[in-house]
Amino acid sequence: LEDLEAMPEIPSLGPEPPIVRIPEGWFLMGSDASEPGQDNERPVHRVWIDAFELAACQVTNAEYAKFLAADSHHKGHRKPLHWDDPNFSHPEQPVVAPSWFDAVAYCEWLSALTHKRYRLPTEAEWERAARGGAEQKLYPWGDAPLESLENYASRWKTAPERVGRAERNAYGLFDIGANVHEWCADWFDADYYHVSPERNPQGPPEGKRKSSRGGSWRHQTKVSRCAARSSIPPEFQYADYGFRVARDLAR
């Protein structure tokens, strides 16, 4: 955590978000029989992830508005559903209801603007980041129950919270596992863990649903376990879906 004090203020006012470096290393991905997990989270398997960078916060309305304003770069990418709904329109709230294609287009626009490679994280990268360097813990903060979170019962009533206001996990990530589901790069396969490679898994080569991670303001259980998986078709636009950008390390 030695770099946390040097992190920029949240949220960023420029086109690039505050970024956290996720170190390379092995970790145990998935949930074992002792956890309240789903079959698609098993078996637990060892995975190596190369170092990469991940945005400290989910992409905000303010950041997404800059993408929409860049007319030459967003042909066919209209304002997301709920863009003008006052429940979801604060500049510091995460943008909601972009499709997976919209999220990818945003990454491509930001890459062209900054000459750096922005993209969506893989499922494996997301889970490593959410765990914060600790093995087999249930939640981004550890194994303490959800009710241990401050004001848990009164939060996320009708919409996601503004980013950067909750506690950071051990890597310095805000709302990792909460607020909105986050699109991942991978196609989803419930049985993928049985054939996943050990190093930098990218997901199956094709599919019908795209993977997502993290919890949702709209669900009864507001924060997801680190190992929990979810997916929807890539064209869907839901009010509890958003995304967080990853960035390749400069070579």
Give each language-model segment a name.
Residues 1-7:
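Long amphipathic alpha-helical scaffold segments
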Residues 7-9, 199:
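Generic alpha-helical structural signal
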Residues 10-80, 97-101, 177-178, 185, ...:
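A short glycine-rich, aromatic-capped structural motif
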Residues 15, 42, 168-169, 240:
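Short beta-strand-initiation
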Residues 22, 28-36, 80-230, 234-239:
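Functional-site microenvironments in short loops/helix caps that host divalent-cation chemistry
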Residues 239-251:
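Short, structured beta-strand segments at or near domain termini in extracellular proteins/domains
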